[in-house]
Amino acid sequence: MKERFLVTGGARLEGTVHVSGAKNSVLKLMAAALLAEGTTTLTNCPKILDVPYMVRVLEGLGCSVVHSGSTVEITTPAEISSNADFDAVRQFRASVCVLGPLTSRCGKAVVALPGGDAIGSRPLDMHQSGLEKLGAKTHIEHGAVVAQADQLRGANIHLDFPSVGATENILTAAVLAEGTTVLDNAAREPEILDLCVMLKEMGADIEGEGTSTITIRGVEKLHPTQHEVIGDRIVAGTWAYAAAMTQGDITVGGIAPRNLHLALEKLKVAGAEVTTYDHGFRVRMDRRPMAVDYQTLPFPGFPTDLQPMAIGISTVADGVSVITENIFEARFRFVDELVRLGADATVDGHHVVMRGVEKLSSTPVWSSDIRAGAGLVLAALCADGVTEVNDVFHIDRGYPNFVEDLQRLGAQIERVQV
């Protein structure tokens, strides 16, 4: 049964919220458990829909998975299937991260082309070319990417773009390859670093993690481990922008502020008071935000996943903002929904010009992806009246306890069945 959120605008959000493990990390760590026979335990896992989806994928490959609260235990047998179940994989984009581990462990991988958010083209070209340089043969057939290799061998690999997914699949393939792999122009996102930390805990030989050049010396075997998932910087950033948009005061825990440095700096420019701690931060805003320009870039640039929040705050800011999207070409789809709420926006290619308005007005809107959905809820908090936010299953894929956390912060929001 479909659900929607009813959001009453006008509340000033105040209080403390703690973020759980990162969606963009936990799914890749679960896939990495395929690399070692035995039981790998992940803690601080978020309560989001994509985790059970990944559990289905792993169970379809032959793993035994126990998911209890924020802990996931994955027992990988000596022999696993190389064929990832189509019905499970097509549910979400991150499922493609089993490609590297399966090619490495089984010598073959058949992974259905993934589903996920409608935010633009995200081809697997770099995933395939990376595996091919390691010695695999790859092709697309019957709606799946197929990779085969008798023995992967280390290679020098340069990525044309620092793709997060390609970096992850090359890492998980190279750790058991024969010889040394040097990956140049690798993604530097904190979630990549988290994956490298876990792989090293499993016995991988990796240097340069967190930089644009990663060196992987293949080992014969990895062993299972226990690992705590890093905090979700995108969820944390969402709360930061919620505080600024509602002229509120929110303290966020469970996150390293350095992973959100630029996003928090932008809030300072907009007029917010930002205080950072070892494992969190506080954002306080007592005025209408000032207009700020944004452009999304790979880490350490402004995250594309926070672009909807940047557009959201620009909607109600004092002045004109230009937001440039450099990662995904279709991520401005939700701007039409903001216009329905009264936003003054002009989209021109991969730029959107936002002329801030003092107040938005309620109307039904529809979420098109995880982050756009969250951005619409934040905009609804700034609107007069009650806004219906539809297709909220998108939000549930990436935000644990979203409604409950908002209610604790003072928002008037309820989940209703349609």
Curated annotation (Swiss-Prot):
Disulfide bonds: none annotated. Signal peptide: none annotated. The active site is at 117 (proton donor). Keywords: Cell cycle, Cell division, Cell shape, Cell wall biogenesis/degradation, Cytoplasm, Peptidoglycan synthesis, Transferase. It is found in: Cytoplasm. Gene3D superfamilies: Enolpyruvate transferase domain. InterPro entries: Enolpyruvate_Tfrase_dom, Enolpyruvate_Tfrase_sf, MurA_subfamily, RNA3'P_cycl/enolpyr_Trfase_a/b, UDP_GlcNAc_COvinyl_MurA. It comes from the Bacteria. Phosphoenolpyruvate binds at residues 23-24. One of its GO terms (molecular function) is UDP-N-acetylglucosamine 1-carboxyvinyltransferase activity. Pathway: Cell wall biogenesis; peptidoglycan biosynthesis. This is UDP-N-acetylglucosamine 1-carboxyvinyltransferase. It comes from Corynebacterium diphtheriae (strain ATCC 700971 / NCTC 13129 / Biotype gravis).
